[in-house]
UniProtKB/Swiss-Prot annotation:
Example GO biological process: ATP synthesis coupled electron transport
The protein's Enzyme Commission number: 7.1.1.2
Subunit structure: Complex I is composed of about 30 different subunits.
Cofactor entry: [2Fe-2S] cluster; [4Fe-4S] cluster
Lineage: Eukaryota, Discoba, Jakobida, Histionina, Histionidae
Keyword Cell division: no
Gene expressing this chain: NAD11
Keywords from the named record: 2Fe-2S, 4Fe-4S, Electron transport, Iron, Iron-sulfur, Membrane, Metal-binding, Mitochondrion, Mitochondrion inner membrane, NAD, Oxidoreductase, Respiratory chain, Translocase, Transport, Ubiquinone
Protein name per its UniProtKB record: NADH-ubiquinone oxidoreductase 75 kDa subunit
Amino acid sequence: MVNVFVDGLSVEVKKGATILQACAQVGIEIPRFCYHERLSIAGNCRMCLVEVEKSPKPVASCAMPVMDNMKIFTNTPLVKKAREGVLEFLLVNHPLDCPICDQGGECDLQDLTMVYGSDRGRFHEYKRGVEDKNIGPLVKTVMTRCIHCTRCVRFATEVAGVPDLGTVGRGRDTEISTYIQKVFNSELSGNVIDLCPVGALTSKPYAFTARSWELQSTESIDVSDAIGSNIRIDVRGSEIMRILPRLNEDVNEEWISDKARFCYDGLKRQRLNNPIIKENGQYKTVTWEKAFNFILKNLQEIQNSNRIVGVVGNLMDVESILLFKELLNKLGSSKIYLESSTPILQLNDDEKEDQILNNADFRNNYISNTPLAKIEESDLCLLIGTNIRLEAPLLNTRIRKRYLQGNYSVYSVGPTNNLTYNTENLGNDISTLLEISEGRHPFCKKLMKSKKPLIIIGTHVLQRTDGTSIIELVKTLFKYTQIKTSNWNGFNILHTSASSVGALDLGIGSTKRYSEKISNSKIEKHFIYLLGADEIRIENSKEHFIVYQGHHGDYGANIADVILPGSAYTEKTATYVNVEGRVQNTKSAFYAPGNAREDWKIIRALSEVLNKKLPYDSFEDIHTRFMSIAPHLLKVNAIEKNKIVIENSLPFKGLIKNIGFKPLFNNFYLTNAICRSSQTMAKCSSIYKLN
């Protein structure tokens, strides 16, 4: 530790800390434009100048490390004069168009001009004009406002791993630009909007729609993937105007994906507002009572409870999943499947039940056991059947962050992917995994030397008919590596669905496994209840009676005989469990449109009509039930600590097909019903396909 004096206050700081960090430690905020705690130090705006004893001139506090007994002064006439001079130079070419700038009210330049700026200018020449750049459908550029802090350049290069932004020209002609008019091709591009201290980079979808002081904010989480990024929903009236990231060091730091940030316009399109039934091939809007009675009538025609099937969608909350499971159990069915692991639902005589994972009673068999914040402790990474850049962009940034620290290697088994760090592909062949498990592959030597290896298994593995066997094969590595020790667990299942871990916590762990031969016998009519399931494909769907409960008119609604309008994640207070097992809550920002209701309330009302009444009249009743079956679901923003059990790996006896892994999805922007209803996401999809 080093002792320094800031404006006469003594403070101890870590050796190597900067003057700016020392000032922050005693509560003195130093003005800055280019400095950001998550980016490398540039030191090019000079706004953070301070006076240091025995220094001939002011120094940049963001770049100067402290020394023992250093005396720092932040509020002297020299410092004020220096900051005023720097600000005057920054305003020389600034257009001063605050009334029409979307950054107004949230602009660092605006705020600091109020403190250090003058009421008149001394520059009487023509201001420099800079042509605006087209860097994609999400980020609007007004480059005349740019002050060359280079935050966007450093973010793109260091965090996003996409060096598309840079500086061109020199001196007065310096500009921030892309290479030969290329778009900024990153899943995290929207974060440069938050980083920009002026109005040079703003949101295209949000442009000219609202001012920050008109908005009401609600703290919530994102459900577009299984990371559970913390977000802030800004609303005016009953319309979402924008979504911003919320700081959570343990989950998303302060970044969010473009899908989380910009898909919100899909929440006002293709919405289901009223119950609908299909009679004689025609859809009719009806009351809730008539829709429930129509379900009861058709359910009574199903004589065998084995013909009652439920599918849990990717965006569903834990409370609704619990009631859904209990309702189907009361109807005599245990056939409840996860949409994320059952891409195709075939109903035939050759079907048989199986578990997604063996030992699903133990939580560490189906979650990512390495907390996101501890990924930086790993010293080697093996990716199996996953394109982590598309399936979990914020997990990808964590791995890239560790990669940039050095002495880190990333290997993959599966298709070759364009990740944001160097990856050695070991092949897309099951025989490669077999060689690794038997210790015959050259990679095994590196794996054995690793003290804290990280293994990440993708969702595509769970969708394979031999997925359970592949996971058990990977577990045989425990016997000669340190993947799982008394103080480290590097075994991770990467889910891509926000509902998967919560559903598995509630015991919904079965999926469909089929024999190779498909039966030609007549398919009996099934009662299929889709709870927000829009990604699943049902063979011979016209032969069955299908109930769809959800919020968008997507695939599920198109094949349904009854449509029950539910609430989106922005319209309900609900519980979700992320990929690492962390329990988090969404908060209602406004009411659902029309006659749509919260999903758990719909299931509760339906149970009464079906004479299978569920004993839950309030949210508190459901949480009381959690206390007895899964008490960890009540511990918000916490990960239930699981005792690390070192398994005695048995010889592998499973059957695995020698078929390579396939991409889970190729289009990052259209992975759920909300995104597919979003015009912004559609633009992204079409533009980035061409690039």
